[in-house]
UniProtKB/Swiss-Prot annotation:
PANTHER family: PEROXYNITRITE ISOMERASE THAP4, THAP4 PROTEIN. It comes from the Bacteria. A motif (GXWXGXG) lies at residues 20-26. This is Ferric nitrobindin-like protein. It comes from Streptomyces griseus subsp. griseus (strain JCM 4626 / CBS 651.72 / NBRC 13350 / KCC S-0626 / ISP 5235). InterPro entries: Calycin, Nb(III)_bact/plant, Nitrobindin, THAP4-like_heme-bd.
Length: 190
């Protein structure tokens, strides 16, 4: 069930399904990078203004689902307009800042995003842009990300299945049962 806080800015009601603390596991696989399972914690929060604050922490998991090392941290701000157009400003610890645009689907809690602008530091490594799909399915938050570099065309590179605040043991169990990422990257949306 989706709860709508009484102090949520009215413009954000369509994004209320994102609110809360989420945790789970996913798969990362991209040419030139380590293929791994990862754990993830995501928080979507609000303070009454017309945006959601987003923070995501990921870490590499071993075969038993235990944390090995940090993978990536993202932080950002999500907005939606009256036409269900979504905009996201995001910064990553790897030295990348992105502006994403997309929209909330009609009649279902699903958001498709694509990068509009990317700025990166020299240390960040190659990155040209990406796409993301977020969906609220049976009270879980699922997402798949695609990215492109000058050398690699746009392709899936990460996907995750998140539940509202779960224990570390539940995250480990989810990680042990993850399938490999399929070629189309839509591991959790079929």
């Amino acid at each position: 069930m989706i709860e709508i806080p009484s102090d949520l800015h009215p413009d954000l009601v369509p994004l209320a399904f994102l609110l809360g603390n989420w945790a789970g596991a996913g798969v990362s696989d991209f040419p030139g990078a380590e293929k791994c399972n990862f754990g993830q914690e995501v928080t979507f929060s609000h303070d009454g203004r017309d945006f959601l604050e987003y923070v995501s922490h990921t870490w590499v998991l071993d075969d038993e689902g235990k944390q090995v090392r940090p993978l990536e941290t993202e932080t950002g701000y999500w907005r939606i307009d009256k036409d269900r157009k979504v905009e996201v400003v995001m910064a990553r610890d790897q030295g990348v800042i992105e502006i994403w645009y997309g929209e909330l689907a009609d009649q279902k809690p699903q958001i498709d995003l694509v990068t509009d602008a990317v700025a990166r530091t020299a240390a960040s490594g190659p990155y040209s842009g990406g796409k993301r799909l977020y969906g609220y399915v049976k009270s879980d938050l699922m997402w798949v990300g695609e990215k492109a570099t000058p050398e690699v065309e746009l392709r899936p590179y990460m996907s995750a299945h998140l539940k509202k605040v779960v224990t570390p043991e539940e995250v480990a169990e989810m990680a042990r049962n993850l399938p490999d990422m399929p070629d189309d990257g839509i591991a959790f949306f079929k």
